[in-house]
């Protein structure tokens, strides 16, 4: 019995076949990495944040209906058929905390607006924005003082009008 050792050329062919087979089908570790990375980077905002954002976009004193809130939550990617109980629970908790105020209806129905706590926070943010903008406005005011104030211009026009009226008589 003679042992036939495979030639070096046959090893190369076999190795080439193995590489081709592995390159066509992704390994299990590669297929697991792909979806996990995508889900970690694309995270949805919480339901309460979505609700508060939609109510805040409407304004402090305006109302938002339950249907409009459901539509906003479903647009962000939540399945409302499966998450209706969660949606109702989040709404009721926001009302209890004082972040939302229920204008009409009972329970998790009716229309809602921002509560006092949330309205106060939004007013503080608006004041901060105004403070940031004031230095820019002061600069424009100083330029106006160099050119002349509007009050002095109005006084000049009043004097001209009086003179014109006096000449007509």
From Swiss-Prot:
Q: What broad class describes the main subcellular location of this protein?
A: nucleus
Q: Which residues form the H15 domain?
A: 43-116
Q: Where are the residues of the annotated region Disordered?
A: 1-36, 118-154
GO function terms (MF aspect): double-stranded DNA binding; histone binding; nucleic acid binding; nucleosomal DNA binding
Origin organism of this chain? Rattus norvegicus
UniProt record similarity statement = Belongs to the histone H1/H5 family.
* Cellular localization per UniProt: Nucleus; Chromosome
Per UniProt, the ranges with Basic residues bias are 118-142
Composition bias (Polar residues) maps to 1-10, 19-36
Q: Cite the source lineage.
A: Eukaryota, Metazoa, Chordata, Craniata, Vertebrata
Q: Name the chain's protein.
A: Histone H1.9
Phosphoserine-modified residues are where?
62, 65
| Top-level taxon of the source organism | Eukaryota
Q: What does this protein do?
A: DNA-binding protein that may be implicated in chromatin remodeling and/or transcriptional regulation during spermiogenesis, the process of spermatid maturation into spermatozoa.
| PROSITE patterns cross-referenced by the UniProt entry | H15
| Transmembrane feature ranges | none
One Gene Ontology term from the biological process aspect of the record = spermatogenesis
* Disulfide bridge map: none
Keyword terms, alphabetized: Chromatin regulator, Chromosome, Developmental protein, Differentiation, DNA-binding, Nucleus, Phosphoprotein, Spermatogenesis, Transcription, Transcription regulation
An example Gene Ontology CC term for this record: male germ cell nucleus
């Amino acid at each position: 019995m003679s042992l036939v050792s495979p030639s070096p050329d046959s090893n190369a062919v076999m190795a080439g076949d193995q590489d081709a087979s592995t390159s066509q089908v992704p390994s299990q570790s590669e297929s697991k990495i792909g979806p996990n990375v995508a889900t970690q980077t694309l995270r949805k905002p919480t339901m309460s944040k979505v609700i508060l954002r939609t109510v805040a976009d409407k304004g402090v004193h305006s109302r938002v209906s339950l249907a409009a809130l459901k539509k906003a939550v479903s647009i962000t990617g939540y399945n409302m058929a499966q998450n209706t109980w969660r949606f109702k629970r989040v709404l009721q908790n926001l009302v209890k905390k004082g972040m939302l105020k229920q204008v009409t209806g009972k329970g998790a129905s009716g229309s809602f607006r921002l509560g006092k706590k949330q309205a106060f926070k939004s007013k503080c943010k608006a004041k901060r924005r105004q403070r940031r903008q004031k230095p820019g406005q002061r600069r424009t005011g100083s330029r106006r003082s160099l050119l002349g104030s509007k009050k002095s211009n109005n006084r000049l026009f009043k004097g001209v009008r009086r003179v014109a009226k006096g000449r007509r008589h």
